[in-house]
Amino acid sequence: MLEPKWLDQAICQYEMPDSQELCEEIIERLKYSTRWNQSATVGGVQPYSRESDQISFQEESPPVEHEPILSFAQQCLENYLEKLSDAKNQPPFGLVEGYNILRYQGDGKQGYHAVHSDHGYPDLVHRHLTFTMYLSDIDEGGEIEFPTQGVMVK
């Protein structure tokens, strides 16, 4: 049974059970990829806010090793909607964009998180829900900040 840790009235954190080996496998497979690009924001690269590289994946064809994580994300979404009944009073949910895996540079960070679209598509600017998952292999750092809510998540 999923039990989120609530950090704010709308922000919660889920732990994927027995995920360490899977996360290590994904990190190892991506380590030597030639697909890494500097992370960008709408309007272009803003290195002061994103000290990371990223690889983008399409939602309709994820790598097989990502499937357990995406399945867990679906379970989390269902649990979140069950816990927050107001979230159900919205247009239907769907994955309308691909996803990124980020690699932080040194002691880099994701300096902010807000309602924005990395790719600039007008429909994505008004995201209803954002899902962030960490495949962290470090003990310190790697937080993401939600400044509007005053929340830091690791």
Predicted regions: what they are:
Residues 1-154:
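Fe(II)/2-oxoglutarate oxygenase catalytic core
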